[in-house]
Amino acid sequence: MPPRKSFWSGPKAGIIGVSIAVGLAALSWAGNNLGGASGSYPEATHKVTLPKTLLDGGYTLAQDLSEQGESALAGTSEADIRDAKAVVGQYTSVDEDGAGVLVLSGMYGRIKNPDSVRSSMLKGAAEADGATVAVPPKDIEVAGSDVTVSCEVVTTASAGGEKTPFAMCAWADDNTGVSVAEVTPKSVAQSPESIDLDAAAANALKVRDEIRKPIA
């Protein structure tokens, strides 16, 4: 059976649903589980967008879920973030052999403590129903970039009890905080420990370059 059919015919709906839930849980934690940093709020200079394609056209936007993201951010503490706006999208691969799913869940605003936002997003991922952190978060420095990306491996349990592993990465800066979860046939077939988090971090930075734009 071709990889695309085997991947999409069974776990597709569950994988998409749980990966979206994981992204929304991460977003909720980013806005509501921070400690309250000292100092002033940065100037708002950048925003997060939802382009029609990602990763050089490899993924196409299937759903704009930003309204659900706004609900996840409801009650966001202004102790660390001001003027927060949610941006959430689900993308699917345009490659017939790839059959990937990518969920982008983030926000933009004025972020006082980006490091806390980044770590909170990954902590929040484990709060989604059916999700477990199989490989704990680690900070990854990608060559050629001064942006710290944190990545972990999350597993989700299907109705049949099978676990689906995927990498989830997050970054945050003075204006943007985003998590990126990508599920592919390759990741589904791997053990959590064998998923390449360095490659996932590099991909997350490519996504960052494509979605983070100056405020006009």
Language model segments and positions:
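C-terminal region of N-terminal signal peptides and the immediate post-cleavage residues
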Residues: 8, 26-47
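Membrane-topology and secretion signals of cell-surface/extracellular proteins
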Residues: 43, 65, 206-209
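Intrinsically disordered, low-complexity Pro/Gly-rich regions
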Residues: 1-10
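Short, hydrophobic alpha-helical membrane anchors of single-pass surface/secreted proteins
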Residues: 10-18
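A small/polar (G/S/T-enriched), proline-flanked helix-loop surface module common
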Residues: 50-167, 175
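Core hydrophobic alpha-helical transmembrane segments of single-pass membrane proteins
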Residues: 17-27
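Alpha-helix capping and helix-coil boundary motifs
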Residues: 9, 113-121, 195-199
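Extracellularly exposed regions in secreted/surface proteins, prominently low-complexity, repeat-rich
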Residues: 143-216
